[in-house]
């Protein structure tokens, strides 16, 4: 697990104005990915002798970030996007023009109430997530994928959802 200083800035793959509130998305996801690849992962390998498959799991905007990395690098062999922010502007166009870089297992999940919101930007998360699953099912680099709907809204049982994603990914190997 790792933390970032600026959630909206460090996990967003590109710049966008705020979808709600006034905290814009600064588009520093590429810098975060470079830090993972050039600093954190090599340090973990050196300090702990970790030399096996690497999974990236994220929740909310970190879930979008995790999924985005599968299109940007071949370093991760499994991805989980739990309640991923697939409502993010231009995400649907992005996935149509990019390919998954590494043979991967990819887990998607969403709360059943997440798309039932008055915010029109956030309301598209359900359709976008279902579309993402269809795209992944047809991607030759994706070994297995699933989309699991959980009860509740975005913040309901976040830890339980993350555990479910880890369990599914481990069962795929």
Regions found by a protein language model. Name each.
Residues 57-62, 66:
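Gly/Ala-rich beta-loop-alpha elbow adjacent to hydrolase catalytic centers
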Residues 3-6, 80-88, 111-114:
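Active-site nucleophile loop of the alpha/beta-hydrolase fold
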Residues 109-115, 126, 130-133, 137-173:
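C-terminal catalytic histidine-bearing segment of alpha/beta-hydrolase fold enzymes
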Residues 53-58, 82:
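Short beta-strand immediately N-terminal to the catalytic nucleophile in serine-hydrolase-like folds
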Residues 30, 34, 38, 122-134:
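Short, surface-exposed alpha-helical segments at coil->helix boundaries
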Residues 68-77:
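Conserved hydrolase catalytic core segment
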Residues 1-35, 39, 43-47:
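Serine-hydrolase catalytic machinery in alpha/beta-hydrolase-like enzymes
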Residues 85-103:
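Flexible "cap/lid" loop of the alpha/beta hydrolase fold
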